[in-house]
Design a protein with these regions (language model features):
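Actinobacteria-biased recognition of intrinsically disordered, low-complexity terminal regions
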Residues: 1-50, 228-247
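Hydrophobic, aromatic-enriched alpha-helical segments typical of multi-pass transmembrane helices
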Residues: 41-73, 79, 83, 87-230
């Protein structure tokens, strides 16, 4: 009597068997079909524009504002806040410039998605502090506590920002690497200490120190945006070339 062969359940897939997506991907890669690499997140052109406008409008504002002041005003000794203060002539020029700078900083922080979220939030806080400086004009008797609070907040957030921008990923521009951002932070901290000392001592170079510190610190978001935009473009172009060759 012939015995029917029993089916081998271990070798016969059932209807409940399914292929896991990660296993399928691994099999495709092993078979010579590599998974398409993820494209780098680009920096939009409008973010580069807002990052450029912030330092450009800041410098233009204090140059035009200083030109409208009487001969007694000295940009070497007196701060930018005097231009937007109640004692300044045509103070609307510097006030409008500060409003534009703050808005550009907020827009840059919102659109610079190539950096981590804490760095974006801190740049937005810097913009809000700049708006606060414009909203609290300095009286003729000197800066108010609210004005000083916004000014100090702007200095602190600007010094800390490079730390949050730093990246450990390979093939990154030096300026956004850990060592590059640490160097920038040390420079910003040194300039800020110089500014605080000049403000405390009431030296004759307070205006010059403030302008130098503000201009250098306002340029860094533009440098970061340009570096990340260029890196993302090169990486995406290289990945497209790899996909074309493997396809």
């Amino acid at each position: 009597m012939t015995q029917l062969a029993r089916p081998d359940l271990a070798r016969c897939p059932s209807g409940r068997d399914h292929v896991r997506p990660d296993c399928a991907t691994s099999e495709l890669v092993a078979a010579g079909h590599p998974e398409r690499p993820r494209a780098a997140r680009p920096v939009p052109g409008w973010v580069v524009s807002t990052a450029f406008l912030a330092p450009a409008v800041l410098v233009a504002g204090w140059l035009i504002g200083a030109a409208l002041q009487p001969a007694s005003y000295s940009p070497m000794r007196e701060t930018v806040s005097v231009l937007a203060g109640y004692s300044g002539t045509d103070r609307w020029v510097m006030t409008a410039a500060l409003l534009v700078v703050g808005a550009c900083q907020i827009a840059t922080g919102a659109g610079l998605t190539a950096v981590r979220l804490p760095a974006r939030v801190l740049l937005i806080l810097t913009g809000l502090s700049t708006l606060g400086i414009a909203a609290t004009p300095e009286p003729a008797t000197g800066p108010t506590s609210r004005h000083l609070a916004f000014a100090v907040s702007c200095v602190v957030t600007t010094v800390v920002w490079p730390v949050l921008v730093a990246r450990r990923a390979p093939a990154q521009p030096w300026i956004v690497s850990v060592y590059g951002c640490a160097t920038v932070t040390v420079i910003f901290a040194g300039l800020s200490c110089w500014l605080l000392i000049a403000a405390r001592d009431g030296g004759g170079d307070l205006g010059m120190v403030e302008r130098l510190t503000s201009a250098v610190q306002a340029l860094f978001p533009l440098v970061v945006a340009l570096a990340l935009r260029q890196t993302a473009g090169r990486r995406n172009q290289r990945q497209r070339g790899q996909v074309t060759l493997t396809g």
